[in-house]
Structures are given as structure tokens and as C-alpha cells.
Amino acid sequence: MTFRKLRLLMSKYGFSILFMGFELWASFAAFFWLNRWFPHWLSVAVIGLLYVSTILAIVNRNTPPENKVTWLLIAVIPVFGSLLYLMFGERRLSKKEMIQLKNMESMKFREDNSHQLRKELKQESKAVYGLVKSILSMDHNADLYNGTASTFYPLGEEMYEQLLEDLRAAKKFIFIEFYIIDEGLMWNSILEILEQKVKEGVEVKLLYDDIGCMATLAGNYTKRLRKMGIDAHKFNKVIPRLTVAYNNRDHRKILVIDGQIGYTGGVNLADEYINHIERFGHWKDSAIRLDGRAVKALTRLFLMNWYINRGEIEDFDRYHIENKAVEGEGLYIPYGSGPKPIYKSQVGKTVYQNMINQSTDYVYITTPYLIIDYDLTEDIRNAALRGVDVRIVTPHIPDKKLIQIVTRGAYLDLMDAGVKIYEYTPGFVHSKQVLADDEMAVVGSINFDYRSLVHHYENAVWMYRTPALKEIRADFDHIFEVSQEITEDTFRFTWHQSLIKEIMQLFAPML
């Protein structure tokens, strides 16, 4: 057993898991106690009522059919299935959270020239205008921006040096929100700068996901950071209680400096993301740096999750800096995506669908996981059947072998429609990027899987006719050169892999 695993087992996380297991066992035991000490007809009636109520709740949920089928299969298990659904199946807001949600909807700052930009875009392209309108309708805090320069980084290590330089130049505030932080060269060099910036009077806020950092940071790490003057908190903190909220992780990657410069993409703050250490071959990731007006949206996204997690209303006007417009072509929409009922629509999925459906020449996609529902599968297939050059790149060396089996399980159906599938031969592709027709692109944290599209808090940047698109296209061209194209002749499942795939696909909405 490694030191990390031992530390995790002996930490509060190990205790929480143990206590949650006890809660589940106690609930299960209560029904056997009911059956033993009360009339048989009463226990049958209670269990029957629970079973019927669970089935009705699942059927009437506003969720994808695949999700319903999975939970219906689980609900068939007597007592245990209903308990699992009650604890993990449906997220409901408390009264306090409903008040917070209303407050969030009122806390927004719009871009002054957004209306004019949309008007001009509508005259130029009604199709693209419709896509923009869709994003702004689903994420009420998103907006359309110009006056922004962008730099695309095809590797985490290329972003790293510029990030350090930007952090050293911070004057007012630094916001950091990441899924994974791990002590090592990358994080320690960032932390050293943050500590110095605090001494200079710069405000530093840090938000990291508690489960994402469960195996990388000590349970009391926030205390250490606060002693340095960094306002650090865990997102959706793990406590010894069974709750569906643990499904909703903060998978975002956001870093904002003075409201003027912002970073996002697939890169977490750990050494494998800059290839300082090797875990699964060469780590292929990407990031985007924004300088200018569009950074307002990243600032707002951070403050929204800060508020969701902390319940503290920040004075948005403090951070609504009139950042200078930077000369740069094209339009940008940094947007957020997340679980219901915080987000009423699946923003990340819908943006991907709209880009795929509007494409006429090509759509290129990289994703570490390919576990998608029927609707998105059909959109990708139909694009290929229309004659669009659709290419999807996934890892050749996986971080999770069982998940790779499910990912590969999607290949044949897509290839049958003419979709080209590639595996990144040098190692693990972790970047989440989509490029369509040299016209628009998305770079962010959103994987092509249920966890990203349904359960997690995510973010990305949609770009239209920006200079970065050429850099993204060059990156895709290089990826295709070093990757292996999958064909029916080169791709075969063994019998036991096929069995695993069939079983795992039943539970795909939970993966």
C-alpha cells in the first residue's frame, strides 16, 4: 500500500466513507427489523410503497432516458435499490439553497456592448447567432465579448511558464478554482508566488474540490493556506453523511488575475499535467489564455461557485473592473455548466450538439472519455452521414482501464456512420476541445461523458473567428500525425472485454 493510500485511509475521508457505509447498513437493517417485529403485511406494505414511490419518482424525472433505465435497474433490487436512489439519485434544493439560487440570478454584470454584438452577428450569420442565443439563454450569467486576445497552449508545460509570469505581475486579486491540486513542482512554484503576493497586499481566493484533492492534499491543507493569508476553501466538503450532492463535483479549471487575464482548459495544478512526471505516457492537454473583456465572465463564474460553496454574497462590484479592451479579432463566450437544478439545461452538452449539428465541413474532437447518450451519439453520426469530416481522439494509454473499455464500446457505432476514431498513441490525451469548420471552437474542462455533461460543475470558452482557431487547428493536425486511426480490422474486443463493456454500459450514466 502506497503512502498516499494509507494517508487517505487514515484521514477524515476514510472515516467518512466508513460512516456512510454504516448509515447504509443501518438503513438496510431497519427494514429487516421491521419485518421481524411487526406484522408481515405491514413490512410488505412499507416496502411496496417505497418501491412504487421510487419507480414513480424515477419515471417522472426530467432526465435522459439512459439515466432512468440505469436507476430502474438499481431500483429492482429489494430495499437496497430504493435506499440508493433516495441517497444518490435525485438532487433537491433546500430552502436555503433556493434563496441562494435566486440571489445568484440577480448577481450579474452584463457586457455593455453585448446587444450590439449580437445584432451584428445576427445579420452576419443567423445560425451562429442562434447558437449564441442558446448559450446565453441557458447560462444567464454568460455574455458575448469582443476586445479580447487569446493564446492557445497545446501542452500544459507551454502554459506553465506564462502563467507564472502573469501571477508575478498581479496587483489586485487572484482567483483560483481547480479540481485537482497536487504538491510538486507546478503547485509549489505557484504557491511561492501566491505567498509573496499576499504580502504585497494582493487578495488571493482559492477553491478546490474536496474529492478531487482527496488523495493529493492533506485534510487540513486549507488551514495551512489560510495561515499564509490565502482565503482557501474546499468545494462540496466531504462529511460523514450519505447525500447525492457528492455526485456534483467542481471539475472547473479557472484562474483569474486582476480581472484582466484568465486561464482555463483541461490542465489541473499537478506535475503530470506539465509532463514533469510521467503517469500514462505523454500527457496531452491544452489551455487557453484570455486577455481583455471576456475575462469578466471567468471572474463571474468563479464568484458564482464561491457563493454556492460558501453561502457568502460577494460584492460583485468590487471585482467588476473595467478591464481594458485588447486588440483582437473574433468573439468569445466563457460559460458555465453544471447539475440540475442549479442549471436548468445541460449547457455543455447542448453547446457541443449545436456545434456538431451546424458543421458543414469538419468537426474535430479530443476527449479523455467517450461515454455519451443516444442523442449526442446520433448527432455525431448524422454529421458524418451528411458528409462532414468527423474525427474523435481518445487516449491509447488510459488512466482507468475499465472506463477505456466503455469508451471503446462507442467506437463501432460511430465508425459505422463514417466517424473517424483516433487513439493518441504517445499516451493520455486529457484535453477537451472541439473545432468546427475553422469558424468556431470550444476549449475547457468538459469531457464527453455523463459526469461532465450531467453531474459536474464545468466551464469552457466558446470562440468564433478568433486567431486562436489556427493554433487549435495546427494542434489537431499534429495529434492526427502521432495518433493511430482505429478501424474495424485493428479494433477487436476479447470475449471478457465485451462482457465488461455490456455490464458497464448499463451503468454509464453514473460513470
What are the residue ranges of the model-derived segments?
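Charged, low-complexity intrinsically disordered terminal segments
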Residues: 2-38, 116-511
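Transmembrane alpha-helices and immediately adjacent membrane-cytoplasm interface residues
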Residues: 46-118
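Structural signature of hydrophobic alpha-helical transmembrane segments
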Residues: 37-46
